[in-house]
Curated annotation (Swiss-Prot):
Part of the 30S ribosomal subunit. Interacts with proteins S7 and S18. Binds to IF-3. It comes from the Bacteria. GO terms for molecular function: rRNA binding; structural constituent of ribosome. PROSITE patterns: RIBOSOMAL_S11 (PS00054). Pfam families: Ribosomal_S11. This is Small ribosomal subunit protein uS11. GO terms for biological process: translation. Located on the platform of the 30S subunit, it bridges several disparate RNA helices of the 16S rRNA. Forms part of the Shine-Dalgarno cleft in the 70S ribosome. SUPFAM superfamilies: Translational machinery components.
Length: 129
């Protein structure tokens, strides 16, 4: 009886024509979440979820594979057009955007929503290599 309640319906919604792709490119990883216009998650993927570990997660190639995976899952729901919101300073920003365009989506707008402080918290110390 408990097993019946534990079942979760997956991917029940179809035919969502347009959505928003949120690309979060940090120094350590790149996460891509594709939502509908209201912000409900349709699909997501990340470089870590694609099997990359450690410093390989922050590469542009890992971001490209993650974007292709998220795009393929979103295309199963009938998504055709995307607005892209890019956030963060990571190296996977451009490659994730190119992968979304190459997956056959019509990108209508690209926004940079990286949070920029108006002299807020003290930043972490500079790296000396």
């Amino acid at each position: 009886m408990a097993k019946e309640a534990a079942r979760v319906k997956r991917r029940e919604r179809k035919n969502i024509a347009s959505g928003v792709a949120h690309v979060n490119a940090s120094f350590n990883n790149t996460m891509i979440t594709i939502t509908d216009a209201q912000g409900n998650t349709i699909s997501w993927s990340s470089a870590g979820a694609m099997g990359f570990k450690g410093s390989r997660k922050s590469t542009p190639y890992a971001a490209q594979l993650a974007a292709e995976d998220a795009a393929r899952k979103a295309a199963e729901h009938g998504m055709r057009t995307l607005e892209v919101e890019v956030s963060g300073p990571g190296s996977g920003r451009e490659s994730a955007l190119r992968a979304l365009q190459a997956a056959g989506f019509l990108v209508t707008s690209i926004r940079d929503v990286t949070p920029i402080p108006h002299n807020g918290c003290r930043p972490r110390k500079r790296r000396r290599v």
